[in-house]
Amino acid sequence: MFPLGSVVEVITGERGFVRYAGEVENRKGVYVGLELLPEFAEFGKNRGVVDGREYFKTKNNEKTGIFVPFDKCKLASSISSSPSPKIDGTAASIGMGFPPMSPNLQSSIPRLTNVSSSSNLSMNTISSTALTPTEKILQKRIEDLLYERQNHQQQLEEVLATVDQLQSLVTNFNDQQDEVDELRERITLKEERIQQMRNEASQRRFEFKTTIECLEESSNRAIETYENRIAELEAQLEMYMSGKSEDDLLFSLQQERDYALNQVEILQERVDTLMKQKANSSTANEKLSHMESSSPTLTNASFESPKRGKGSNDLPENHPQRRQTLEFYEIEIEVLREKVEKLQALSDEKDFYISKLEKSLDRNDTTPVPSDEKLSNYAAEKENLVSRISELEHTIEQLTINNERDNERMSPAEFELETTQEVEENDSDSHDDEETWCEVCETNNHSLQECPTVFGSTDEA
């Protein structure tokens, strides 16, 4: 048997290193697996693989392997320079366990290829016939050492290549670390923005839910109010359709007419009050301007008083804003007068319908009419009167709202110069009527819960 790594020569003249010695599958006898020398590489037949089974590996996985029967090869007579054989996978993985080396380490390591090969050249000239057994042993030892040197050199080159690769990876990692930090920061900002948007969405859902609940509650209240009003109207209609007497109908119409006239008188009184307030305001402003011009102390006190606003009464008499305010009050008063006249016209029209009903009653006394036809006529007349009354109530309501707005727009300074007696009377009246005061009609005849303007007239029931 030839030792592994020894140089063997085939009978055909090819030389190579012994990589395998033993049996080959599906072959009889003992075979020697050789990795041919570079000068005989063209005669190679395989890469150390036979029938799919790998027996050895060739350098760079080249096709330089050959299997020869043991009896057709012999030990080479001389030593020649041989290429660095390819080590197996276990030897190639040795370099991965070394620690990182500095970039200058590769240049500082001496290359084994620089060693002079004069000893090899001189040994090639030694004839195999002139070697003694001791020299043959030494020759074998030299061949083994050369083979080990080639393996070590190859391992060192692979380690240096691995170091270079690791250094490039470290450099790339340092370059990419900044990008990774930037990406992490952007991800953090995105997460904060997403959390903020989620909080805003939750708040909006809560507000929307609260608004929906408020709307539902308001809708339920309005529905309940309308249902109660509809029930009252249906009850009134049933009472009218069941055969209510003509006298009762006429009496209710007269009461409604009186109520409308009362409302007209109240509105007329309000118009007169506004006119008086306007006259008192102009007189008070003249007195106030005279007092301010005559007394500097009073002027300073008036400006320092927190109760006096900066309305139109604080301005001089010939100031454009003051004149504009007075003109506005005059326009409002004219509008109220027109509405009062319109209400008076509606009241006259209602009187006409009442007189017409009285005539029809007188005529019915002489010429009786069937009860069904009479009730239908009364129902039609009643519907007309109800529509007229609703229009009148709507007009009164609008007039009341406008009057309240006018009272809100008036400056508090207009009422500062009223007499003490009028203030006390108003305070006593408001105190007496506090329990039964209607904010819509501004009267003490009934409370807000019993207001006919809002819930309809109680006389209809």
Curated annotation (Swiss-Prot):
Residues 278-303 have a biased composition (Polar residues). The keyword Cytoplasm applies. GO terms for cellular component: cell cortex; cell cortex of cell tip; cell tip; cytoplasmic microtubule; cytoplasmic microtubule plus-end; cytosol; microtubule end; mitotic spindle astral microtubule end. The modification Phosphothreonine is found at residue 367. Keywords: Coiled coil, Cytoplasm, Cytoskeleton, Microtubule, Phosphoprotein. Residues 22-69 form the CAP-Gly domain. GO terms for molecular function: microtubule binding; microtubule plus-end binding. The modification Phosphoserine is found at residues 82, 84, 289, 294, 305. It holds the Pfam family CAP_GLY. PROSITE patterns: CAP_GLY_1 (PS00845), CAP_GLY_2 (PS50245). Residues 134-418 form a coiled coil. It is found in: Cytoplasm, Cytoskeleton. SUPFAM superfamilies: Cap-Gly domain (SSF74924). InterPro entries: CAP-Gly_dom_sf, CAP-Gly_domain. One of its GO terms (biological process) is microtubule cytoskeleton organization. Residues 278-323, 417-437 are annotated as: Disordered. Has a role in stabilizing and targeting the growing tips of the microtubules along the long axis of the cell, directing them to the ends of the cell. Acts as a cargo for tea2. Monomer. Interacts with tea1 and tea2. Interacts with tea4 in the presence of tea1. This is Tip elongation protein 1. It comes from Schizosaccharomyces pombe (strain 972 / ATCC 24843) (Fission yeast).
